[in-house]
From Swiss-Prot:
Residues 54-65 have a biased composition (Polar residues). InterPro entries: Paramyx_V_Zn-bd. The keyword Metal-binding applies. GO terms for biological process: symbiont-mediated suppression of host cytoplasmic pattern recognition receptor signaling pathway via inhibition of MDA-5 activity; symbiont-mediated suppression of host JAK-STAT cascade via inhibition of STAT1 activity; symbiont-mediated suppression of host JAK-STAT cascade via inhibition of STAT2 activity; symbiont-mediated suppression of host type I interferon-mediated signaling pathway. It is found in: Virion; Host cytoplasm. Interacts with host IFIH1/MDA5 and DHX58/LGP2. Forms with host DDB1, CUL4A, STAT1, STAT2 and STAT3 the mumps virus V-dependent complex (VDC). Zn(2+) 1 binds at H170, C189, C214, C217. This is Non-structural protein V. GO terms for cellular component: host cell cytoplasm. Its main location: virion. GO terms for molecular function: metal ion binding; molecular adaptor activity.
């Protein structure tokens, strides 16, 4: 038996294979008939039964109709983003200190860089980065005059932790927020005896020695 294929037989095999390929390529596509990742509809199990693979299961018509009616009430919902959130990247954070009256503070609006136009959830992140960089470069704390440090004695306690702290003063605090597509920096003073909290808020003096105003917050109240 001759194990070698002749040249004319090779041409016939190639022509036959090309005809078979052209037949399937020219045939109209009725739908997805194979179990592939693209043919599976994301969702719960009742919805998955309604895939094109259902025709390969026994009793295709009855099972397919029943699965579609069951899947329609299976609780699968589409997520709809409100127009307000889709346009500006989410709910705007109100400034927590705006509602308080009788307190001094300075509000600085830092506009967004026109070269950066983030959308969605990344918008607030980009705005916060811009505001943080500009705030760090703009607000530089003045060097403080060094005070003599007393000798430490074990058990003597700290003067800053006692309610009768004779050295009252203020500390400067900042709060970053974005409103209407703008980064706003709000700065104010709090007594040094007040606690440091994550939320932006005003505190009153607890030791009785902190001044009402200091050289840092005098400009917060405007001209006298």
């Amino acid at each position: 038996m001759d194990q070698f294929i002749k040249q004319d037989e090779t041409g016939d095999l190639i022509e036959t294979g090309m005809n078979v390929a052209n037949h399937f390529l020219s045939a109209p596509i009725q739908g997805t008939n194979s179990l592939s990742k693209a043919s599976i509809i994301p969702g719960v199990a009742p919805v998955l039964i309604g895939n094109p693979e259902q025709k390969n299961i026994q009793h295709p018509t009855a099972s397919h109709q029943g699965s579609k009616s069951k899947g329609s009430g299976s609780g699968v919902r589409s997520i709809i983003v409100p127009p307000s959130e889709a346009g500006n990247g989410g709910t705007q954070d109100p400034e927590p200190l705006f509602a308080q009256t009788g307190q001094g503070g300075i509000v600085t609006t830092v506009y967004q860089d026109p070269t950066i136009q983030p959308t969605g959830s990344s918008r607030s992140v980009e705005l916060a980065k811009i505001g943080k960089e500009r705030m760090i470069n703009r607000f530089v704390e003045k060097p403080r005059i060094s005070t003599p440090v007393t000798e430490f004695k074990r058990g003597a306690g700290s003067g800053c932790s006692r309610p009768d702290n004779p050295r009252g003063g203020h500390r400067r605090e900042w709060s970053l927020s974005w409103v209407q597509g703008e980064v706003r920096v709000f700065e104010w003073c709090n007594p040094i005896c007040s606690p440091i909290t994550a939320a932006a808020r005003f505190h009153s003096c607890k030791c009785g020695n902190c001044p009402a105003k200091c050289d840092q917050c005098e400009r917060d109240y405007g001209p006298p």
